[in-house]
Amino acid sequence: MTEFTTLLQQGNAWFFIPSVILLGALHGLEPGHSKTMMAAFIIAIKGTIKQAVMLGLAATISHTAVVWLIAFGGMVISKRFTAQSAEPWLQLISAVIIISTAFWMFWRTWRGERNWLENMHGHDYEHHHHDHEHHHDHGHHHHHEHGEYQDAHARAHANDIKRRFDGREVTNWQILLFGLTGGLIPCPAAITVLLICIQLKALTLGATLVVSFSIGLALTLVTVGVGAAISVQQVAKRWSGFNTLAKRAPYFSSLLIGLVGVYMGVHGFMGIMR
């Protein structure tokens, strides 16, 4: 952080605001940040571009607010809470959360797939011993989706969103609330930058850089939401292998998230031991 501190003292960091926005956008492509939930939400409510923008801005507000709360809370709790000492601990804590999330995702996906296979075998056994030679004519159809597996994580989000919003018009307050809860996980890098700015009495610059970083993150979230609403169904129709890839995606995601968590944990531990 020596180079960045020097830039701040020279007053040249203002020129890096566009770069910070770009870094925030790239940071949004990393695992996490509730991109899956937000994309699923936009698809479920058949959201418009305006609603996707609103969702991303709400996530930006909560993301920025949490960064400020953690930074100022740490400054109040301990006068010796410096950026150099805070960053490794934040990385280590984040690593524990990320690795735990990766294990949970992998276990839940595996368990959901196993339960689905057991239900399928039981369903096939019943049909083998009972010939259904009667028809149900009740004026409505019983639709059972036994033929396609959906991972437990995606199914839980889909069922929850469908139960809450299916058949009803979604209000702006509901969209804002969903976006606010999606941005509650702070970024250690953004907190560190803000702490450095506070220590150098560059509070306005620190606020601007954090907001710029969050704007970049919001752009990614908005793009994901809008892109999901427009393209997912089209891709599924045109490419038969999309569903197969989607079934395996949680395993790859959990592995990638776990590797990121291990890297952050090692990096944070090395920083603490220095």
UniProtKB/Swiss-Prot annotation:
Annotated region described as Disordered, given as residue ranges: 127-153
Cytoplasmic side: 34-56, 108-174, 231-251
Residues in compartment: Periplasmic: 1-12, 78-86, 196-209, 273-274
A GO cellular component entry from the record: plasma membrane
InterPro entries the record matches: Ni/Co_transpt_high_affinity (IPR011541), NiCoT_RcnA (IPR051224)
Membrane topology annotation: Multi-pass membrane protein
Disulfide bonds: none
Keyword annotations from UniProtKB, A to Z: Cell inner membrane, Cell membrane, Cobalt, Cobalt transport, Ion transport, Membrane, Nickel, Nickel transport, Transmembrane, Transmembrane helix, Transport
Keyword Methyltransferase: no
Induction: By nickel and cobalt. Transcriptionally repressed by RcnR.
Cited function: Efflux system for nickel and cobalt.
Name under which the protein is recorded: Nickel/cobalt efflux system RcnA
